[in-house]
Structures are given as C-alpha cells and as structure tokens.
Amino acid sequence: MPGIIVGVDGSDHSRLALAWAMREAVQHHVPLTVISVHPAPVRPATQIFWPVPDDLPDRSYDPEFARKALQGLVDQVAREIAETAPEITVSVALGDAAEELVNASRDADMLVVGSRGSGGFTRLLMGSVSSQVTHHAACPVVIIPGGR
C-alpha cells in the first residue's frame, strides 16, 4: 500500500505538515513515509585549478545522524498529536529536495509539504520546493500553510 509521503526540512511549516500527515495516515489507516533531503555539497570554485575527485567523501553530511535526528522529530510530533501512530518509515537523502520528493511521489497516494521551508529565500506565495512539487508530482499534493 503506497500511503502518504511528507517532506520535512526542520522548519515550522514542515513540522505542521508532518503533524497533519500523521493524522491523515491514522484516519485512513495508511503508512506514512517521512523524507528529509539535505542539499548536495557545492564544490568550491578552486576546483577549476585543483580538481577534487568526485568520489571524495563529504564530511559535512552524516546520513546516520540525519536519520536519527529525523526519527527524533517524528517521535516528538507523534507524542504531541496524542494519537496511535501510523506505520512510519523515515528516509534521508542527499540531493535536490523537490526532485527527490517528485520521484518519491510516483509510489504515493498523497504528498504533503509545508508552504515554506528552511531555505534562505522566501517566495511570495510558496516556497520553491512546494511550488515545484505542486507542478511535477505524480500524485495529489497537499500544501500545509504555516500557523498564525
């Protein structure tokens, strides 16, 4: 059963999206997949003169630490909504958040994201990830607005 996918980046908007998606998963008895995507490291411009091999490990991203942090957030939100938690899978990835969520949407009944994320620039109406997944996801998309 595909279920619900929710994108989480640690922002308040994504936390609200996570809580909403959990409630929906409980209500409809479907599994929930929580995905957090960390941006791929940008190679310094000095590589033009001193190339760095592509297979050099990135020391700034620790997938196990990221997975544990995401699981901690999921557990905390599950306690706050005080409902029986649905079947939850957590997943972390390195790359472009919109691209990863669009790819994941191919196997989902619904994709849930917050209206704005933790990016440095805010768009007029929606964050860039929520805007991109709205246009390219393979399943229905729910955009959760921030609290007031």
Describe the function of each predicted region:
Residues P53-G72:
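A short acidic, glycine-rich active-site loop
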Residues L101-A104, V133:
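Structural alpha-helical scaffold elements that stabilize or flank donor/cofactor-binding regions
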Residues V92-E99:
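Charged docking surfaces used in two-component/phosphorelay signaling
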Residues M110-H135:
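Glycine-rich, Arg-bearing micro-motifs that act as flexible, cationic patches
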